[in-house]
């Protein structure tokens, strides 16, 4: 059964960058971290921005999937595990969005000493992260800039019928 959204939220590259820089600012001082763990794929871009802003060069990645394009699944698939740490101590786990919280709950069990942050958070998953920048309604489908294609739109003038 497919997941249906009543609302849509479109994020531009500029908006994402601004929100992620704010997320990074909240994580200062940077010296408290040994490295960053990006949650692939959505957390890759935010993790790169956080890495740059905090001047942290050690960046690992964990690939966990709970989505199949537009449908959320209950089962999680680990496609690449973390190699930089065993318990997450001193690491900042970065993702784009916490939705149901299933992915973050799963990662918290594996990395109990890490700090977990996301750019966006929905009510069902908020308690699974330590910090986030903006909250969204649970029934909102978020469109990230890497999921969209830019195209030309005809001006309104001349389209009157």
UniProtKB/Swiss-Prot annotation:
Catalytic activity: GMP + diphosphate = guanine + 5-phospho-alpha-D-ribose 1-diphosphate; XMP + diphosphate = xanthine + 5-phospho-alpha-D-ribose 1-diphosphate; IMP + diphosphate = hypoxanthine + 5-phospho-alpha-D-ribose 1-diphosphate
Sequence positions that bind Mg(2+): 96
Binding site for GMP: 99-103, 141-142
Biochemical pathway: Purine metabolism; GMP biosynthesis via salvage pathway; GMP from guanine: step 1/1; Purine metabolism; XMP biosynthesis via salvage pathway; XMP from xanthine: step 1/1
GO MF annotation, one: magnesium ion binding
Lineage: superkingdom: Bacteria
Positions with a binding annotation for guanine: 99, 142
Gene3D superfamilies per the UniProt record, alphabetical: 3.40.50.2020
Names of the cofactor(s): Mg(2+)
Keywords annotated in UniProt: Cell inner membrane, Cell membrane, Glycosyltransferase, Magnesium, Membrane, Metal-binding, Purine salvage, Transferase
Residue stretches in coiled coil: none
Subcellular location as annotated: Cell inner membrane
Residue positions binding 5-phospho-alpha-D-ribose 1-diphosphate: 41-42, 95-103
Any one GO CC term of the record: cytosol
Record-listed E.C. numbers: 2.4.2.-, 2.4.2.22
Enzyme class: transferase
Protein's membrane topology: Peripheral membrane protein
PANTHER family in the record: XANTHINE PHOSPHORIBOSYLTRANSFERASE, XANTHINE-GUANINE PHOSPHORIBOSYLTRANSFERASE
Family: Belongs to the purine/pyrimidine phosphoribosyltransferase family. XGPT subfamily.
Complexes and interactors: Homotetramer.
HAMAP family given in the database record: XGPRT
Function field: Purine salvage pathway enzyme that catalyzes the transfer of the ribosyl-5-phosphate group from 5-phospho-alpha-D-ribose 1-diphosphate (PRPP) to the N9 position of the 6-oxopurines guanine and xanthine to form the corresponding ribonucleotides GMP (guanosine 5'-monophosphate) and XMP (xanthosine 5'-monophosphate), with the release of PPi. To a lesser extent, also acts on hypoxanthine.
Name of the featured protein: Xanthine-guanine phosphoribosyltransferase
Species this protein is from: Idiomarina loihiensis (strain ATCC BAA-735 / DSM 15497 / L2-TR)
Chain's gene name: gpt
